């Protein structure tokens, strides 16, 4: 597998459709076996990157998908198109996972429209590179923690009453948590 070249976008969140080359979100050789048939997965940050790849893979396994994303509408629509091309339904829910009320509403909408919730994937995260810790503002620090830590907590809290025995919560993390990065001090600590 080839490495993606380093790319930088000033806008946050970044827009996957503007990346060149485009990241590969699906493996054409992978064939689903129905392991998630009749299940529903809610994936935060499912509009792009790892979240999009998970949404497509889960759809290939038969799961209906709810994608929670901030405001990357075109990326989210592309994910919906890719998921629905596999057969299952794909619900798009735009909002800020750092807002507890939004997380409650996203879970309510998922259960209301897709009938249940079996898998929660806490994948959304944000990072804002800075040259030194002195450049990390209080607002940036709070925003990073609100998305990366509070968002995971709020979404899990909202989902738990709907998850039956045998359901799953998956929390993704970054290698940056283990290796560190001098330009991502706040992100690495989440």
Located regions from the model:
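Catalytic loop of short-chain dehydrogenase/reductase
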Residues: 26, 32, 125-127, 168-190
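Catalytic Tyr-X3-Lys loop
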Residues: 134-153, 170, 189-190
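The beta1-alpha1 cofactor-binding region of Rossmann-like NAD(H)/NADP(H)-dependent oxidoreductases
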Residues: 73, 94-107, 138
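Conserved mid-core segment of classical short-chain dehydrogenase/reductases
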Residues: 3-4, 104, 112, 127-142, ...
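Amphipathic alpha-helical dimer-interface segment in Rossmann-like NAD(P)H-dependent oxidoreductases
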Residues: 56-57, 108, 112, 147-167
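Non-catalytic terminal and boundary segments that flank Rossmann-like NAD(P)-dependent oxidoreductase
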Residues: 1-37
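Conserved glycine-rich Rossmann-like NAD(P)H-binding loop of the short-chain dehydrogenase/reductase
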Residues: 63-78
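Canonical Rossmann dinucleotide-binding motif of NAD(H)/NADP(H)-dependent dehydrogenases/reductases
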Residues: 34-66
């Amino acid at each position: 597998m080839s490495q993606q070249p380093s790319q930088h976008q000033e806008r946050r969140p970044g827009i996957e459709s503007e990346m060149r080359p485009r990241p590969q979100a699906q493996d054409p050789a992978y064939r689903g076996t129905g392991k998630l048939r009749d299940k529903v997965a809610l994936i935060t940050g499912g509009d792009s990157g790892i979240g999009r790849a998970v949404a497509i893979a889960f759809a290939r396994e038969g799961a209906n998908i709810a994608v929670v994303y901030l405001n990357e509408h075109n990326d989210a629509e592309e994910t919906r198109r890719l998921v629905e091309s596999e057969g299952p339904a794909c619900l798009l829910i735009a909002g800020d996972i750092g807002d507890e009320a939004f997380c409650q509403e996203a879970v309510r909408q998922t259960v209301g429209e897709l009938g249940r919730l079996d898998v929660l994937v806490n994948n959304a995260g944000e990072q804002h590179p800075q040259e030194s810790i002195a450049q990390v503002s209080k607002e940036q620090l709070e925003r990073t923690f609100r998305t990366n830590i509070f968002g995971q907590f709020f979404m899990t809290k909202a989902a738990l009453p709907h998850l039956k025995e045998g359901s799953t919560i998956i929390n993704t993390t970054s290698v940056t948590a283990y290796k560190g990065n001098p330009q991502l001090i706040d992100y690495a600590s989440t």
